[in-house]
């Protein structure tokens, strides 16, 4: 008798996607981050749903409703900190997932890669709007500064700003619509994840060698499900440790002060996972130029497949490209550090140098080194 998971209309879709899915036998732990992101998304949707039951999206009561959740709701503090620190875990996994794609040449699956970039933008938008909801000082001023960047767009910038605000400044209308979008976007992200997986299963997974692995495939279950479960345990242990021992480690103390339009914080900055892009934005003195650089810092991922000049797909056997890749990682860490520093000497020049290096490595040095490696292969 045929197994029900292979005949049932719904179960056979799940079976072909997760159970009997053929996968390369050489996948390393770097391939765990896709499933970890799925767990992060599930945690965020669940905790967010319960938080939304108690939150009020009104400027007069938003801050107090978050305080009420932490003090009066059963395990409300746990929900709140799981949600806030879960976002940090989400971005750690997201950046490692993208980094793995860059290192092992997964961007050659262009449809999967492009949907991934859309996902990255959607998750960033969701996180930004979520940061505004507690209505603390950094929430309010972060929203004001970030949305004000749209005014740099010629002709329509100011109108676009006021349209997003729902008035002449960040106020009640802004908070209400941000809450609506923040609640709605994770479900759009979930739909995009399904499209991402659809395209991935059309081509099959890449592997560390970058060589087609059709003759050497194994079932996803039980081999990779066990491996994924180990990843879940490690990540959830790290998240639980962060939430239970140091829940405010990655947050900003200014967000415990209620939003006040009359008092500007000494240093307005976004959450840590946006600091690299914020540093690139600040490194250009011109407002429009800064906004373009900010958008390009993420959108540049879309042209990485075009810039792939190497005869080998993966960087596993390309030591020169590996050196450049880790230099790029160091530059991103530098930009993240600079984004959290005040705008003064020597941070300004360090930020500008790191920003130039970031674009230089991706646009020029990577393709050039790839061509050099191709030449060295002839020796």
UniProtKB/Swiss-Prot annotation:
Which PROSITE patterns does the entry link to?
A: CYTB_CTER (PS51003), CYTB_NTER (PS51002)
A biological process term (GO) from this entry: mitochondrial electron transport, ubiquinol to cytochrome c
Any single GO CC term annotated in Swiss-Prot or TrEMBL for this entry? respiratory chain complex III
- Which SUPFAM superfamilies does the record match to this protein? a domain/subunit of cytochrome bc1 complex (Ubiquinol-cytochrome c reductase) (SSF81648), Transmembrane di-heme cytochromes (SSF81342)
Free-text cofactor note = Binds 2 heme b groups non-covalently.
An example of a Pfam family matching this protein is Cytochrome_B
GO: which molecular function terms?
Answer: metal ion binding; ubiquinol-cytochrome-c reductase activity
Annotated residues that bind heme b b562 are located at 83, 182
Q: Does the keyword Iron apply?
A: yes
Q: How does it sit in the membrane?
A: Multi-pass membrane protein
The membrane spanning regions, by residue number, are: 33-53, 77-98, 113-133, 178-198, 226-246, 288-308, 320-340, 347-367
Record's keyword terms, sorted? Electron transport, Heme, Iron, Membrane, Metal-binding, Mitochondrion, Mitochondrion inner membrane, Respiratory chain, Transmembrane, Transmembrane helix, Transport, Ubiquinone
Q: Which cofactor does it need?
A: heme b
Q: Which residues bind a ubiquinone?
A: 201
Chief location of this protein within or outside the cell: mitochondrion
Cellular localisation: Mitochondrion inner membrane
Residues annotated for heme b b566 binding in this entry: 97, 196
Q: What does this protein do?
A: Component of the ubiquinol-cytochrome c reductase complex (complex III or cytochrome b-c1 complex) that is part of the mitochondrial respiratory chain. The b-c1 complex mediates electron transfer from ubiquinol to cytochrome c. Contributes to the generation of a proton gradient across the mitochondrial membrane that is then used for ATP synthesis.
Q: Which PANTHER family match?
A: CYTOCHROME B
Which protein family is named in the record?
Belongs to the cytochrome b family.
Note on file?
Heme 1 (or BL or b562) is low-potential and absorbs at about 562 nm, and heme 2 (or BH or b566) is high-potential and absorbs at about 566 nm.
Query: How does this protein assemble?
Result: The cytochrome bc1 complex contains 11 subunits: 3 respiratory subunits (MT-CYB, CYC1 and UQCRFS1), 2 core proteins (UQCRC1 and UQCRC2) and 6 low-molecular weight proteins (UQCRH/QCR6, UQCRB/QCR7, UQCRQ/QCR8, UQCR10/QCR9, UQCR11/QCR10 and a cleavage product of UQCRFS1). This cytochrome bc1 complex then forms a dimer.
Q: What is this protein called?
A: Cytochrome b
Q: State the organism named in the record.
A: Artibeus lituratus (Great fruit-eating bat)
């Amino acid at each position: 008798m045929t197994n029900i998971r292979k005949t049932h209309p719904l179960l056979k879709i799940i079976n072909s996607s997760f159970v009997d899915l053929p996968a390369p036998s050489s996948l390393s732990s770097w391939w765990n981050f896709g499933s970890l992101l799925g767990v992060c998304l599930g945690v965020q949707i669940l905790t967010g749903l319960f938080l939304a039951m108690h939150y009020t999206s009104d400027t007069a009561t938003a801050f107090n409703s978050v305080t009420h959740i932490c003090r009066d709701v059963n395990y409300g503090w746990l929900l709140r900190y799981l949600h806030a620190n879960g976002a940090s875990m989400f971005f750690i996994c997201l950046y490692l997932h993208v980094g793995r794609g860059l290192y092992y040449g997964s961007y050659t699956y262009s449809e999967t890669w492009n949907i991934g970039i859309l996902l990255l933008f959607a998750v960033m938008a969701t996180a930004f709007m979520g940061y505004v909801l507690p209505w603390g000082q950094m929430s309010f001023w972060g929203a004001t500064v970030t949305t004000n960047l749209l005014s740099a767009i010629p002709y329509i910038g100011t109108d676009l700003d006021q349209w997003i605000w729902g008035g002449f400044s960040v106020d009640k209308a802004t908070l209400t619509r941000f809450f609506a979008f923040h609640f709605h976007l994770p479900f759009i992200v979930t739909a995009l994840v399904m499209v991402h997986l659809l395209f991935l299963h059309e081509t099959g997974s890449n592997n560390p060698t970058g060589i087609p692995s059709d003759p050497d495939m194994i079932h996803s279950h039980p081999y990779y499900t066990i491996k994924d479960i180990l990843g879940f345990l490690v990540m959830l242990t790290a998240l639980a440790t962060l939430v239970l021992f140091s829940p405010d480690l990655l947050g900003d103390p200014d967000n415990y002060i209620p939003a006040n339009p009359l008092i500007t914080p000494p240093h307005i900055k976004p959450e840590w996972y946006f600091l690299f892009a914020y540093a690139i934005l600040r490194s250009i003195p011109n407002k429009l130029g800064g906004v373009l650089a900010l958008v390009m810092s993420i959108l540049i991922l879309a042209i990485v497949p075009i810039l792939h000049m190497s005869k080998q797909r993966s960087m596993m056997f390309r030591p020169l490209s590996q050196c450049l890749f880790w230099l790029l990682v160091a530059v991103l860490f530098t930009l993240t550090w600079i984004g959290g520093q005040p705008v003064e000497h020597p941070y300004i020049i360090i930020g500008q140098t790191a920003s130039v290096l970031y674009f230089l490595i991706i646009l020029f040095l990577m393709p050039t080194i790839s061509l050099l490696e191709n030449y060295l292969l002839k020796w």
